[in-house]
């Protein structure tokens, strides 16, 4: 199946400065709202599989997994600080009215 944008949630459901987990076609995805810009990525730390929405602390575009201290850039998924060494998968996001669409 080719990737396509699907409506995932309403933007109003994700307050600025927060990270929320949603299920999109059976994939658990975390969505971060950084000052009105939305980023989507796998809701699983690549170190020990903690939920990034549940255990993540967002500071600007840096998400820290409080399970063990790994840091990720929510824009790219890149690891900024260990112990994680593998980036998180990111998903393209677009806005349609109040709907947030994620490409899966």
Region spans (language model):
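Short Gly/Pro-enriched loop/turn and capping motifs at secondary-structure junctions
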Residues: 71
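Short Gly/Pro-enriched turn/cap motifs at secondary-structure boundaries
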Residues: 83-84
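Short cysteine clusters
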Residues: 45, 65-68
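N-terminal pre-ligand scaffold of iron-sulfur
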Residues: 1-60, 74, 78, 87-104
């Amino acid at each position: 199946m080719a990737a396509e944008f699907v409506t995932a949630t309403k933007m109003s459901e994700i307050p600025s400065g927060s990270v929320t987990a949603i299920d999109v076609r059976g994939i658990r995805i975390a969505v971060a709202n950084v000052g009105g810009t939305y980023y989507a990525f796998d809701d699983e730390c690549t170190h020990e599989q903690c939920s990034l929405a549940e255990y993540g602390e967002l500071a600007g575009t840096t998400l820290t997994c409080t399970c063990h201290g790994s840091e990720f850039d929510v824009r790219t998924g890149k690891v900024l600080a260990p112990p994680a060494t593998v980036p998180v998968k990111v998903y393209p996001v677009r806005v349609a009215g109040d709907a947030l669409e994620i490409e899966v």
